[in-house]
Amino acid sequence: MTEIVALYGDPVAGNPTSIMQNAAFREAGLDFVYVDIRVSATELPAAIAAARTLGFAGLNCTIPHKVAVIPLLDGLGESARVIGAVNCVVAREGRFIGENTDGKGFLQSLRGEIDPRGREIVLFGAGG
């Protein structure tokens, strides 16, 4: 049976993640599909309930849901707890656990250029 993974956000039109994820699933031989689903702020609780009912393998959350999703989950991983926001929801043993890969991904890309330990930095961004 095909596993479903989705992006919940508003807006989601034009987001390239589904193209990348579906290509990666095919390359890895995984029977998964990644779909973009526009979910407004008021629809988020029902959308999380629907993902549970339909047995989604996981979700990505983008604006405006990264903080609002937290009380709708069964728990948080360390990264989401520290950052105070969720961008990934993983279904584990019937529970939805929030994670955050933004910080780890940023540091990994930065470490390819410099070692940030012990340095003061200025970070610019829009926070999405």
Question: Which role does the model predict for each range below?
Answer:
Residues A6, V122-F124:
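Conserved beta-strand elements of the Class I
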Residues D115-E120:
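Short helix-loop-beta connector
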